[in-house]
């Protein structure tokens, strides 16, 4: 076999959402901080194109790059590459990275509980894993500070009319809409319609509402649209279905950890949740993340929360992505039949 590039990947999913992990073959990108390294990858596009575009990738895939941590408290660091963005943080990808580190033997597993600190571009992520018989069975991720941004504001969406929406940050930035008011029960056969409408709503929110993180002015857009179903009370806390539309037009198969964090921040702002309360988010395929408010914390001048989300991850395979020097598409390709709403 001829190859000018070989990248070693352990494939994983967290509650249905793919989050592959690059464990070898890629040198750390330039940058003094993890955020600068993230920004280089986002600008350069070479690695993103190679692993996310067809024929090696696809719109369904997220890929995480393991890099040496820059923060002295961190045991490992990772940079998240999503189909159209290189975000500060991701809950499902944090679970995938933790699963690969522990189940793959990269970080020593201690049963029954392994604790470690990961560094994401958006900040430190404290992880606790419940482990048994060599398997990390459930991953608990203490997320970055999350906060409500705008509450109950109007948004005009062409072809729909005026919606009442919220915006919030949970490690990534969201416009949040009432799924039931738009006729969605958040079931599998609605995925295409949710994806298409979600992209339109996200684009409208960026044009009309905008977003700027109070401590990181580089993060100045709304990434996703979260369709949130009605809440119900259970003996252990609140529960509700949700679906997140991801650019350029797909639905997250998991409940989206950053969306769970953002939704809990909105509920805290409205007095529906407080410290210690839990929320079970159910995805479009029926998988779930459990969220909990750990504490209150400011994000710049914004009152916020420190959320914890938990879920499960599974390794699905080991791959070596290669580049034959005669391949006319070294950066791959993407077509509108799958890449775009």
Swiss-Prot record:
Keywords annotated in UniProt: Lyase
Catalytic activity line of the entry: trans-3-hydroxy-L-proline = 1-pyrroline-2-carboxylate + H2O
Superkingdom: Bacteria
Record-linked Gene3D superfamilies: Diaminopimelate Epimerase, Chain A, domain 1 (3.10.310.10)
Residues reported to bind substrate: 91-92, 252, 257-258
Induction: Is up-regulated when the bacterium is grown on t4LHyp or t3LHyp as sole carbon source.
InterPro entries in the record: Pro_racemase_fam
Active-site residues, as the UniProt record annotates them: 90
Alphabetized GO MF terms: 4-hydroxyproline epimerase activity; trans-L-3-hydroxyproline dehydratase activity
EC numbers on record: 4.2.1.77
UniProt function note: Catalyzes the dehydration of trans-3-hydroxy-L-proline (t3LHyp) to Delta(1)-pyrroline-2-carboxylate (Pyr2C). May be involved in a degradation pathway of t3LHyp, which would allow L.aggregata to grow on t3LHyp as a sole carbon source. Displays neither proline racemase activity nor 4-hydroxyproline 2-epimerase activity.
Family classification: Belongs to the proline racemase family.
Protein name: Trans-3-hydroxy-L-proline dehydratase
Species in which this protein is naturally found: Roseibium aggregatum (strain ATCC 25650 / DSM 13394 / JCM 20685 / NBRC 16684 / NCIMB 2208 / IAM 12614 / B1)
């Amino acid at each position: 076999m001829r190859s000018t590039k070989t990248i070693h990947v352990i494939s994983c999913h967290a509650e249905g959402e793919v989050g592959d992990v690059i464990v070898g073959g890629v040198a750390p990108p330039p940058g003094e901080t993890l955020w600068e390294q993230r920004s280089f990858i986002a600008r350069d596009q070479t690695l993103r194109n190679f692993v996310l575009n067809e024929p090696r990738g696809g719109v369904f895939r997220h890929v995480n790059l393991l890099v040496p941590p820059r923060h002295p408290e961190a045991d490992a660091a990772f940079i998240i590459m999503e189909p159209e963005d290189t975000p500060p943080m991701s809950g499902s990808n944090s679970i995938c990275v933790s699963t690969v580190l522990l189940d793959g033997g990269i970080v020593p597993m201690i049963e029954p509980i392994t604790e470690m600190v990961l560094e994401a571009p958006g900040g430190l992520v404290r992880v606790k894993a419940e482990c048994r018989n060599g398997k990390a069975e459930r991953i608990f991720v203490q997320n970055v500070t999350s906060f409500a941004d705008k509450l109950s504001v109007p948004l005009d969406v062409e072809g729909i009319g005026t919606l009442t929406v919220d915006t919030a940050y949970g490690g990534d930035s969201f416009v949040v809409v009432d799924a039931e008011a738009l006729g969605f029960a958040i079931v599998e056969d609605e995925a295409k319609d949710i994806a298409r409408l979600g992209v339109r709503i996200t684009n409208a929110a960026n044009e009309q509402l905008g977003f700027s993180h109070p401590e990181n002015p580089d993060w100045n857009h709304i990434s996703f649209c979260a369709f949130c179903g009605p809440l119900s009370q259970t003996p252990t806390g609140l529960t509700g279905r949700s679906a997140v539309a991801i650019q350029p037009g797909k639905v997250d198969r998991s409940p989206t950890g950053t969306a769970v964090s953002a939704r809990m921040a909105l509920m805290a702002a409205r007095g529906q949740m407080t410290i210690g309360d839990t929320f079970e988010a159910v995805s479009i395929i029926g998988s779930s993340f459990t969220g909990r408010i750990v504490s209150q914390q400011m994000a710049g001048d914004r009152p916020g929360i420190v959320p914890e989300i938990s879920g499960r991850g599974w390794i699905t395979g080991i791959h070596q992505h290669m580049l034959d020097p005669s391949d006319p598409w070294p950066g791959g390709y993407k077509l509108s039949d799958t890449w775009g709403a």
